[in-house]
Amino acid sequence: AGIYLYFVFLLPGETYTEPTARRWLFAGCAAVAALVLYLGFPRLGWTRSGLLAALTLAALHRLAIFLPEISTTPWSLGWSEGSRFYNASLFFSRSRYGVAAPTPVLHPTRYLLQSIPFLLSDLPLWFHRLWQVLLWLTAAFASGSLLAMRLRRRGAALSGTVPVLALAAWSFIFLMQGPVYYHLLVIPLLLLWGVQTNRFWRT
């Protein structure tokens, strides 16, 4: 995994920016990782070792994409980054700007989640960027993990920790394809965590 991430994200030049080269590199590194898993845990078998290696590598790739977004640069990392942080700050407009400004009408849940760091004063810009990255990652991975645990409780063929982690990783990758925004996962998270047919009031 480390070799793959180095060649894709750290190696100078554009050798592995071409999709075909990147696919071959991914397949080769996944095959080596699958072999290591199979030799270390023969009970997994070739199929599970291969799937687990590919899922792990893909999840790490998706995680690594977020690292440049935790930047200390004062310049905007995207055309709407500044407005998103400003909209988030409006939930605390009186303490920040001395006036009671209206809260955002568009995507209020997103900006409410992003506003949490504004509870603390004088946090640097990189912390707000880190917080947004954590929202992306935790919402997607928590959704996958809760889904896997729910299926396991309902008697699905998810015996052991490895299948649960594999399903959680696959769900994380699936949700990040779009990606599905973290504020849209709040309700699925509540449903996956809270709904239990044998606990009426909690449900």
Listing of model-derived features with the role each one plays in the protein:
Residues 1-6, 11-65, 156-160, 196-202:
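Start-transfer (signal-anchor) and selected internal transmembrane alpha helices
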Residues 25-38, 138-142, 185-192:
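Hydrophobic cores of alpha-helical transmembrane segments in multi-pass inner/ER membrane proteins
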Residues 9-15, 129, 162-185:
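Aromatic- and kink-enriched transmembrane "portal" helix at the membrane-lumen/periplasm boundary
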Residues 104, 120-141:
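Loop-to-helix entry region of an early transmembrane alpha helix in multi-pass inner-membrane enzymes
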Residues 39, 133-155:
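Transmembrane-helix motifs of polytopic, lipid-linked glycan transferases
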Residues 170, 183-200:
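Specific aromatic-rich, kink-prone transmembrane helix
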Residues 61-89, 94, 98-114, 123:
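Extracytoplasmic catalytic/substrate-binding loops of multi-pass membrane glycan-assembly enzymes
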Residues 147-169:
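Transmembrane-helix signature of polytopic, membrane-embedded enzymes
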